[in-house]
């Protein structure tokens, strides 16, 4: 892993595409979801909710349900709580009110100006993804949108990243993946993409330092990294 941009120009193969995760990378949604669950935890006296929610980061709704039941037991009323949490979330953030992470538009604009292909690979359902990107005014930046309900295996399996590269018509080895979650970095690494970790709620770990090509603090630093790495991966 490289954790700075100074030595990035040593590479020589052009990159063709960048594949983005959505929650925690484009939108500050994971923090919003966490807050909703914290409110439910206080209301219903659910213990250790923060760690439980963090364990679900980067997974599909199906896997999230499984993790919650594994954590709290088969009689945990997850469906009821999830419905209430979702209602709180949508009442606050629908209609373009979900805040974007700093540097999103700048990075997307840079990639378009560079002629790079752009895809989104999110474990979230397609309709939700499309609505959020459209409401934020950035849907048209993406050449392809691949979602969790379009692949058989969720992250950390590489399926969603491989499908994104396939639909873009690029080799995984010639694509960056921008992720904030451990499962996302694992998936991109397994798929032979070049993972860039931009941590959100989850801090970098020794495993992430090993699997990510670079760990950067925000998307504006990703622009600097790609400019330094203009000639390739």
What are these regions, as identified by a protein language model?
Residues 40-41, 60-75, 132, 164-165:
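Helix-loop "lid/cap" segments that line or gate small-molecule binding pockets
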Residues 26, 100, 118, 153, ...:
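Conserved SAM-binding loop
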Residues 2-5, 9-54:
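Active-site neighborhood of HAD-like aspartate-dependent phosphohydrolases
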Residues 32, 56-60, 99-103, 124, ...:
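Short beta->alpha linker loops
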Residues 47-50, 68-106, 114:
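Metal-dependent phosphoesterase signature
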Residues 43-46, 71-76, 113-114, 137-141, ...:
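Short helix-capping segments at alpha-helix termini
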Residues 2-16, 109-112, 125-233:
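Asp-based, Mg2+/Mn2+-dependent phosphohydrolase catalytic module
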